[in-house]
Amino acid sequence: MKNFHVVLEAAWLVRDVKTADDAIGVAISEAGKRLNPKLDFVEVDVGSTSCPACGEPFSSVFIAANTALVGLIFEMKVFDAESAEHAERIAKSVIGKSLRDIPLTVVEVTEFERSGEKGDQQQKGKAKK
């Protein structure tokens, strides 16, 4: 069995905002409320998009008519998965249960070696629920 770090992406809709910073704050707060306290091992962050002209990365936020679409990234470790595809399914299932009606897309799956830390042991138990 292998261990994987899975990164998922979701588009989060935020209404009645005027700035990108407000949209980011509201999106992360709303996602965090839906995930915590059950899934405190899932990391939430804003995704980045590359500028088509210069290639520089910037925050994945688009605002029109005081409504924002924020690209959020969800990261979690999956322990004892049979394959990368199995780890993807586990991560989508665990995170998707809390984020109903929010489509999730797999961005990256990387294998890692278990370090044997106490925190990793706790995450293993939570990831399998």
From Swiss-Prot:
Listed PANTHER family: UPF0212 PROTEIN MJ0068, UPF0212 PROTEIN TK1194
Family statement: Belongs to the UPF0212 family.
The species this protein was found in: Methanosarcina acetivorans (strain ATCC 35395 / DSM 2834 / JCM 12185 / C2A)
NCBIfam families on file: PRK03922.1
Signal sequence interval, chain numbering: none
Protein name: UPF0212 protein MA_1372
Superkingdom per UniProt: Archaea
Any single Pfam family the record assigns to this protein: DUF555
